[in-house]
């Protein structure tokens, strides 16, 4: 039994759980909440990957469909997202499998299109992503004008 309530102060609870583990007081651990927190770490990593990929794809859409507005800001965002995605996948190699998952790709594409529509007022983007994951992540590739 823990002395700090998970529901009222998760930071104090986490510190207490860490202390219990380090002091081998396993019988006092809040196993159910620890398991939830461990699962949430993985979900958080997946959300970050999807979010960064959606922002990258949205900017690639803007680059392709609004060539007259291309500028250093868009190019910088594209480069930053690619670099961040590359770093993130190196830090969490198991995330790489998401990149080839068609269901995940579809969800990311839908998010990217939503972002692009909000930022451009263009509503006739392709139904599915016209680019390969390799192109999207390539530091040397940008889509050509539509």
Show where each model-derived region lies.
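Surface/interface-facing alpha-helical segments and adjacent flexible terminal/loop regions used
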Residues: 1-146
């Amino acid at each position: 039994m823990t002395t700090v309530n998970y529901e009222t102060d998760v930071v104090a609870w986490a510190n207490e759980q860490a202390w219990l583990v380090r002091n081998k007081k396993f019988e006092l651990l809040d196993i159910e909440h620890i398991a939830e927190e461990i699962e949430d770490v993985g979900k958080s990593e997946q959300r970050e990957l999807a979010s960064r990929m959606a922002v990258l794809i949205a900017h690639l859409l803007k680059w392709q469909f609004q060539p007259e507005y291309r500028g250093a800001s868009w190019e910088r965002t594209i480069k930053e997202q690619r670099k961040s995605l590359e770093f993130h996948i190196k830090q969490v190699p198991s995330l790489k499998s998401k990149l080839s998952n068609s269901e995940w790709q579809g969800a990311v594409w839908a998010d990217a299109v939503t972002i692009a529509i909000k930022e451009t007022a263009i509503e006739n983007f392709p139904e599915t992503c016209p680019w390969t994951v390799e192109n999207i992540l390539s530091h040397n590739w940008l889509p050509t004008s539509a």
